[in-house]
Amino acid sequence: MKYFRADLHVHSRFSRATSGRLNIRNLAAWSMIKGLSVMSTGDFTHPAWRDELRRDLVYDDNSGLYRVREKTPLETEIPGFSRPDGVSEPQFLIQAEISSIYKKDGSVRKVHNEIGRAHV
């Protein structure tokens, strides 16, 4: 894949202010609606989320990324939507974030570092 669209800053449902319905199939469905080829998983350090990643994703030797083990039709996951023409199933990058929050000159500063990992 020469060019691709990706969302590399994602959180799992175990993070604050995220949907309780968020799971791998839901991320895959929304990525197809948005025309994304690669999604990150977010929060790979959370034990329950990591268990779901191991259960729901399978490693793709060709790309070095992961794909959904058991595909759910987009229409089933998100009623009222259908897969746009030419959009394929997304691949997943195992990812987490380190958020560094500090004060400087009386202002709060935040730096978000995204960490990718080869295997779950």
Each PLM stretch: what is its role?
Residues 12-20:
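Acidic/histidine-rich helix-loop elements
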Residues 3, 49-119:
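Extended substrate/RNA-proximal surfaces in nucleic-acid metabolism proteins
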Residues 1-5, 9-11:
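Generic start-of-chain signal for non-secretory N-termini
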Residues 7-8, 39-43, 93-95:
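Active-site neighborhood of phospho(di)ester-bond hydrolases with catalytic His/Asp-centered motifs
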Residues 19-31, 103:
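Short, acidic/polar
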